[in-house]
Amino acid sequence: MKDKNLFEHIDKAVRSERLYADGELKREAIHKRFRISRHSLNDLLREHVGMTFPQYINSIRMEEACELMLHHKELSINEIAERVGLKAPNMRVLFKQMYGVTPMDYRQHRHVKE
């Protein structure tokens, strides 16, 4: 399988099977499942998304958290964090690092825009 196809295959599985939602997900699970070395997985991610494995998984988690905040207003931030495989304090820190605002501020700001 060519690198681009392999990356797309891995990315599709991580997203569609919600592998990112496993708070204990380790890169070993991915490289074993797709029968590639740890080094190859790292190279693949660097080449296609310019990220390390934790950065890649956390970016998907944050994308999903944004979607949940916008489309499921009944869910608390704690529930959203749990659904994306994080503890609420960790999600708040990651979210602020990635988007420059807290999840609550993001939700309130997006709600005002709609």
Positions of PLM-derived features:
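Conserved phosphate/pyrophosphate-binding and hydrolysis machinery centered on Walker-type P-loop NTPases
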Residues: 3, 24-27, 31
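Basic/polar phosphate-binding segments, predominantly the helix-turn-helix DNA-binding elements
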Residues: 28-56, 81-102
